[in-house]
A protein has these predicted regions:
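PLP-dependent aspartate aminotransferase-fold enzymes
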Residues: 81-185, 307-310
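Active-site-adjacent loop/helix segments that line or gate small-molecule/cofactor pockets in enzymes
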Residues: 1-21, 44
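Active-site core of PLP-dependent enzymes with the aminotransferase class I/II
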Residues: 170-172, 176, 188-214
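Conserved PLP-binding catalytic core of the aspartate aminotransferase-like
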Residues: 18-19, 307-311, 317-350, 366, ...
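Structural signature of PLP-dependent enzymes
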Residues: 289-314
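PLP-dependent enzyme catalytic core of the Aspartate aminotransferase-like
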Residues: 294-296, 304, 355-415
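Active-site PLP attachment segment
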Residues: 235-266, 278-285
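Glycine-rich loop-to-alpha-helix module at the N-terminal edge of alpha/beta enzyme cores
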Residues: 34-116
Length: 415
């Protein structure tokens, strides 16, 4: 089971881990119980809402016409043209069906273009060997990017010393890595818990340009959430390559790697291929998703929703005399209670909200389906639970309120 969807990440032994159907921001489990999803919304894949009628209709039309052929589907050409229209700095595109694949494609091409093996990274970039090699020799190198104590068993030992993590907004650390190693690629998420400081992204761009390093922005999570396209557009910094996923197909598998011609053409000197990257459903879903996004200005609406949620968390905390830390993109908002019992409180929220018909923890991926009425209902349900947490801060035993174990800690990236 996918790590992010395991019951242990939410409510061990009690979380209804499997679904029967979805619609909007509603999820039904296998027993027919209905829940309002105020959590990860398919791990951020459904910004338009689950089971979106227009996207699903386009997909069903493709299913009826045929999904696979000896020929290529024209939709991948149309999608490439659209992504390049949205990102004029790019000239070419390649498609896959998962974020990990898109990251692996980008690294293969960038290494081919630079002629160098070593990569500096900041953020979460999938599960492939090239990335997990960062933990060879020190299983905490990815602690601030993926998970603490991750043992990279199965990753060839000879990849040790090929990947160097650096911390977001720490330009001096990156510069030292570049000065002391033959770095050919810098790969990073554009924004993490907070935005760039002290012209960080511009300085990274300048460093990459001066040293002949390929700069890659991983927008698999951040793309199409605060801008129509990559969030790098907000900061006026253009990479050499970028990847998009999650929101791109509104729940259907499609990811994209775009880049400058002089970089992307290096793919011709190596081998990158997969049969099912040529299926038709993914690009069809992406084209319709982008059409709906552009018409509805979805990035503005989900940002507005997320901003409202973040403010109301703070208001609710103030009402109950709690101190919380709010972080993330507005449309990927998260909070944590400033307490040694923070993880227990997160578990308590999930437990109590589940009983009220909500899938909830301390992280919300906003979607168009999260209307004001839905958000109001969520906060009405959450209010007394914050009261319970305050009681625990004053001495009540939170463990006595829990019906099972405390949830596990999760990813440390944009959330």
């Amino acid at each position: 089971m996918l790590l992010s969807k395991r019951a242990e990440m939410f409510l061990p032994d009690q979380w209804p881990a499997y679904f029967s159907k979805t619609k909007g921001c509603k999820v039904w489990d296998l027993d027919g119980n209905e829940y309002t999803d105020m959590s990860i919304m398919g791990i951020g894949t459904n910004t338009l809402g689950y089971n979106h009628e227009e996207v699903d209709a386009a997909v069903m039309k493709t299913v009826a016409a045929g999904n696979m052929s000896t020929f290529n589907c024209p939709e991948e050409v149309y999608l490439a043209e659209k992504l390049i229209e949205i990102h004029p700095w790019a000239d070419m595109a390649r498609f896959a069906r998962s974020g990990g694949e898109a990251n692996a494609i980008a690294i293969r091409i960038a290494r081919a273009a630079s002629g160098k093996d070593k990569v500096a990274i900041c953020g979460y970039h999938g599960w492939h060997d090239w990335y997990l090699a960062a933990n060879l020799g020190d299983d905490n190198h990815l602690a601030g990017h993926l998970l603490s104590g991750l043992d990279p068993k199965g990753v060839p030992q000879n990849l040790r010393g090929t990947v160097y993590p650096f911390n977001y907004n720490n330009y001096a650390e990156l510069e030292e890595i570049v000065n002391n190693n033959d770095i050919g690629v810098i790969k990073m998420e554009v924004m993490r818990n907070k935005g760039p400081e002290d012209n960080f992204l511009h300085r990274v761009r300048d460093l990459a340009t001066k040293r002949g390093i390929v700069l890659i922005f991983d927008e698999c999570t951040s793309g199409f959430r605060q801008t129509f396209g990559g969030i790098h557009k907000m900061y006026g910094v253009e990479p050499d390559m970028a990847m998009f996923g999650k929101a791109l197909g509104n729940g259907y598998g499609i990811t994209a790697t775009i880049g400058r011609r002089e970089i992307m053409e290096s793919a011709q000197s190596t081998f990158i291929s997969s049969t099912f990257w040529t299926e038709r459903i993914g690009p069809t879903a992406a084209l319709k998703t982008l059409e709906v996004m552009e018409r509805e200005k979805s990035w503005e609406r989900i940002t507005e929703t997320g901003t409202d949620i973040m403010a109301r968390w703070q208001t609710l905390a103030h009402k109950h005399g709690l101190k919380i830390n709010v972080a993330g993109l507005p449309s990927i908002a998260s909070f944590g209670v400033d307490s040694p019992n923070a993880l227990a409180y997160k578990t308590l929220i999930t437990q109590e909200m589940l009983g009220k018909g909500y899938l909830s923890s301390n992280l919300i991926f906003s979607s168009l389906a999260h209307t004001p009425d839905v958000v109001d209902g969520y906060f009405n349900a959450l209010d007394p639970i914050f009261g319970l947490i305050k009681e625990c801060e004053q001495g009540r035993d939170v463990m006595a309120l829990l019906k099972g174990p405390i949830c596990h800690a999760g990813f440390k990236r944009l959330n």
